[in-house]
From Swiss-Prot:
Highest taxon in the source lineage: Eukaryota
Entry function: J region of the variable domain of T cell receptor (TR) beta chain that participates in the antigen recognition. Alpha-beta T cell receptors are antigen specific receptors which are essential to the immune response and are present on the cell surface of T lymphocytes. Recognize peptide-major histocompatibility (MH) (pMH) complexes that are displayed by antigen presenting cells (APC), a prerequisite for efficient T cell adaptive immunity against pathogens.
Signal sequence residues: none
GO biological process: adaptive immune response
Name this polypeptide is given: T cell receptor alpha joining 31
Gene name of the encoded protein: TRAJ31
Localization in the cell: Cell membrane
Main location: membrane
Lineage, broadest ranks: Eukaryota, Metazoa, Chordata, Craniata, Vertebrata
Description of how the protein assembles with itself and partners: Alpha-beta TR is a heterodimer composed of an alpha and beta chain; disulfide-linked. The alpha-beta TR is associated with the transmembrane signaling CD3 coreceptor proteins to form the TR-CD3 (TcR or TCR). The assembly of alpha-beta TR heterodimers with CD3 occurs in the endoplasmic reticulum where a single alpha-beta TR heterodimer associates with one CD3D-CD3E heterodimer, one CD3G-CD3E heterodimer and one CD247 homodimer forming a stable octameric structure. CD3D-CD3E and CD3G-CD3E heterodimers preferentially associate with TR alpha and TR beta chains, respectively.
Record's keyword terms, sorted: Adaptive immunity, Cell membrane, Immunity, Membrane
């Protein structure tokens, strides 16, 4: 998909949809 995904060390996932 076109989403930008960042995975943090604590396991939290941030998904950014433009």
């Amino acid at each position: 998909n076109n989403n930008a995904r960042l995975m943090f060390g604590d396991g939290t996932q941030l998904v950014v949809k433009p």
